[in-house]
Amino acid sequence: MRLVIARCSVDYAGRLTAHLPSAPRLILVKADGSVSIHADDRAYKPLNWMSPPCTLKEGSGDEEGVWTVINKAGEKLIITMEEILHDSSHELGVDPGLIKDGVEAHLQELLADRIETLGDGYTLIRREYMTAIGPVDILCRDATGQTVAVEIKRRGEIDGVEQLTRYLELLNRDPHLAPVRGVFAAQEIKPQARVLATDRGIGCTVLDYNAMRGIEDDKLRLF
């Protein structure tokens, strides 16, 4: 991971246009190719970002100090450096990922055992389907034979949707699985997470943990 603290301005050109005026900011360049720009007041959420796959070109000569980030859709993030205050790179290695709490692990087990609760005709491929960036909670197929990746959380928030999005981007590169769609499943799904999931074509499923643990009439509310 590369960490750059710099006074910079940022311009985005794509489906929309956006401009961030000059200010001190943190720029993260991760090993997966993503680039994100952060202020000191927004918790984990960046001011702007470019998800992988994308390329970063650092200008030289007349363009020195200008970074251009381009994704596969041709969208551009142009970062104009005025003063670099810090620039360092660190090898973090492979992250072991989040260790699920007991409820999430049990939800995964229950849903895998009763995969048909997602819909008639669903069949399980496997739990903990391993990818290069971590395990997908459940990989299954729907009644039409399409591959479905399911991310399970006790509380569904934006970071869970982002995690599933990364899995989907990777899984859809595999011709043996593609096309792959996503389902975000949780006991409670925050409104912002639902909006983001819907915008990305990801389905949302609210899980009734108590019902799944043994009440005869299993109840899932599908949205």
From Swiss-Prot:
It is found in: Cytoplasm. One of its GO terms (molecular function) is DNA binding. InterPro entries: Endonuclease_NucS, NucS_C, NucS_N, NucS_N_sf, tRNA_endonuc-like_dom_sf. Its main location: cytoplasm. It comes from the Bacteria. Keywords: Cytoplasm, DNA-binding, Endonuclease, Hydrolase, Nuclease. Its EC number is 3.1.-.-. GO terms for cellular component: cytoplasm. The keyword Cytoplasm applies. It holds the Pfam family NucS_N. Signal peptide: none annotated. PANTHER family: ENDONUCLEASE NUCS. Belongs to the NucS endonuclease family. Cleaves both 3' and 5' ssDNA extremities of branched DNA structures. This is Endonuclease NucS. The lineage of its organism: Bacteria, Bacillati, Actinomycetota, Actinomycetes, Kitasatosporales. The gene is nucS.
